Amino acid sequence: MVSVELIKNRLQGIATHPTTVLAMSKTELQSVKECVGKSKAESTYQNLCYSDKLLCEFVKDKGIKDIPVTIITEDLFEEYRFYLKKQGLAAATINRYLCWLSRLMYRAVSQRLIRCNPFENTKYEKTEQKIRFLQKNDVAKLMALKVNDKEAEQARRMFIFACFTGLAIADMEHLQYGHIQTAADGQKYIRKERQKTRVEFVVPLHPIAEAIIKHCKAEQEKNGGGQSVKEKGKTETRTDNLVFPCDCSRSVMSAKLSIVGKACGIRERLSYHMARHTFGTMSMSAGIPIESIAKMMGHASIASTQIYAQVTDNKISEDMDRLISKYQKEKVKEEAI
């Protein structure tokens, strides 16, 4: 329903905000872009760019240039959902793109273009969240692998580092030696804000992670120093060197990591987020309290950490099922004898 405020503005010739879906999408995207390097990560902006792209393609597919927000009903939500399903996208991915459309409607409400979000009561398809992580023997294979390619070695090294620290790829890219501190008892740890959420995390430095840092430091000193960090939107350059300086893009690093995984005989495609999940599951299996894991991983909510507890419980259940099955087979053999 059109608000009284909008009618008044139109009669007076006032149009302070975009009043169509695609125009609103571009404006919202621009506001996110302006926050990159401050309160938003570059990856967040890139993901939303694709949300905008798909929305544009959907409107174009309908044979129109744009859609006024004032005529939108719940039907459009279902039309867009069906369109995304035809693209062969997974349910979780579809939900993410639908959320962008709903976000635009909430923005229209805040700007008094419409009275309420027409999608407020719509249901999103429930998806079972499955996390991918490596077993200890696969991590050991990666650690034993010898790599001659410089970029592939960097990819391997960062993946192993993430397995023992839980750092996301964005946090490793921005990790400086100044983020590594020493406690009164001599224990070294990483203290840093997450690039994605700005939530501080504190994680003790595992001996393997510490060895990787020492190796990186020695290499950089041998080559005459590393790269320093330039924060987006700032002219000053910080003097602390990056632990993992890299001249290639993240996509190249991901491709190299995939090659490394295949070289180790690991069937699943490796990703840096898989390394983070590996840290979470290994920590939970080691009996570390969930509150401590949440702090180490920089989770804004402990609900994000609870998935690792679920994975560990499932693993225990599977192991027990195998044990029972083995016992039953042995019992059948004994009875047969």
Task: Show the residue positions of the predicted features.
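N-terminal DNA-binding recognition helix of tyrosine site-specific recombinases/integrases
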Residues: 54-58, 67, 75-78, 86-120, ...
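Basic, Lys/Arg- and aromatic-enriched nucleic-acid-binding interface segment
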Residues: 95-97, 114, 119-169, 173
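Conserved tyrosine-mediated DNA breakage-rejoining catalytic core shared by Y-recombinases
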Residues: 129-132, 138, 174-215, 231
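Catalytic-site neighborhood detector that most strongly recognizes the C-terminal catalytic loop/helix
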Residues: 133, 194-198, 297-322
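C-terminal catalytic core of tyrosine-transesterase DNA break-rejoin enzymes
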Residues: 160, 164, 170-171, 256-259, ...
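Short, polar N-cap/turn motifs at the start of nucleic acid-interacting alpha helices
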Residues: 179-186, 267-268, 288-307, 318, ...
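C-terminal catalytic core of Y-nucleophile DNA break-rejoin enzymes
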Residues: 195-214, 227-232, 236-259
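C-terminal secondary-structure termini that scaffold catalytic or DNA-interacting sites
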Residues: 219-238, 323-337
